[in-house]
Amino acid sequence: MIAKNIYEMLQDVCSRNKDSIFFVRQNETYADLLKKVKQRAVLLAQRFGIKKGDTVAILSGNTPDFLRSYFAITSLGARALMLDTGLNTNEHINMMKRTDCKLVMAQQSLFIDDAPCPMFDIENIDDTDENEFTMAQTERSDIAQLSFTS
């Protein structure tokens, strides 16, 4: 099967490796990963109204929550704006404004007081019903990720 989008690729990998360990420290399997991605996507859609074409930033270190968030954002057809933790606050704010960012999923220690959109703790995800998840219909030409370079 050739995946049409990032979420279908994830779904395929998780279904073929569902009992394999994805994250050793938390003994999390690929099946657990897929469930958490769906839960996070439901939260983004229901609590924040995130939908296809919106931009959601991620400001986090290299953690499982970063990956869960990335896959959740793209599964909704939204664009993930990657914010480099090594850049300064003004640069982050500029990127958020230029991309019409709707939400920032960030580690709480990296929250920005003057952010032009809401900040949400990337590690503080409530349990939502993953059965309410609906994958967005996307095209190969849809943008999944935004990155700024120097």
For the regions a protein language model found, what residue spans apply to each?
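A short N-terminal helical cap/helix-turn-helix that marks the beginning
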Residues: M1-I21, A144
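Short, Lys/Arg-enriched, disordered terminal segments
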Residues: M1-K4, R47, D129-N131
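Conserved AMP-binding/adenylate-forming core of the ANL superfamily
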Residues: Q11, D19-I50, T55-T63, L67-F71, ...
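Conserved S/T- and glycine-rich ATP-binding loop of Class I adenylate-forming
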Residues: V56, I73, V104, I143, ...
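Helix N-cap/beta->alpha junction signal
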Residues: S60-N62, Q107-Q108, D142
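Structural core segment of the AMP-binding/adenylate-forming
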Residues: R68, S75-E139
